[in-house]
Swiss-Prot record:
This is Protein SlyX homolog. It comes from the Bacteria. It comes from Aliivibrio fischeri (strain ATCC 700601 / ES114) (Vibrio fischeri). Belongs to the SlyX family. PANTHER family: PROTEIN SLYX.
Amino acid sequence: MTTTIEQLEQKISDLECQMAFQEQTIDELNDALSQQQLLITNMQVQMKFMVGKMKTMDSSNMADASEETPPPHY
């Protein structure tokens, strides 16, 4: 009977250990997810800025294809 109680105590101890590792993993994944969300939000802001900048660019500043010199391999 003592062996059974010791086995049960060992199983409980193993489960507690597994649960602790799972909690640590969940916390680490949550931190990584939070950092990625901040990065995505920052990139979205930068993307909106760049799109706005491109929309305001004056297309008349760009040279016409006929005005540009051909590349050196021609």
